[in-house]
Amino acid sequence: MNSDFGENKVLQFIDAESKHTGLLRDVLILSKGYWGYSQEQLEQWRSNLKFEDEYVARNTVKLILDESELIGFFAIVKGDIDELDHLWLLPKAIGKGFGNLVFEKIQSECKILNITEFYITSDPDAEGFYLKKGALKVGEVYSEPQKRMLPKLKFTLKSTIEIHT
């Protein structure tokens, strides 16, 4: 299969486990590196960012694989305010259509969790992707580690019930 055509691929999604916490951090840092952040900034995030075992156990955290090769992960937090807390693809998987497939899976997971809408605090470089998917910008959130404002988005799942008149 040609990996330049993500829409023709079948991805695998497996539950992350506590043994994957370092891997999650590394994927996030490598993904951020794609967007041109300085090595100093990436190292600062690497030293400050930790995924706790409890986070992985309590939330829906899925590793994304293409032909058994890790290409990213996502995390959904169900709570008083439901969130797509993370969606990161490794640089080799960016721009190949995988994001569209992953976002479909995220919506499926949300339906299973009875989530009808969720919020996303987006990296500015990913905001356009979420807007194309139908998310709406509802504000901004200050990020202390990044010392800047990040877009706050809201995505509402489409109902599976269609009324024909």
Language-model-detected regions and their locations in the chain:
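Conserved N-terminal entry element of GNAT/NAT acetyltransferase domains
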Residues: 1-19, 159-165
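Acetyl-CoA-dependent GNAT
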Residues: 18-86, 90-92, 103-104, 124
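Conserved GNAT acetyl-CoA-binding A-motif
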Residues: 110-123
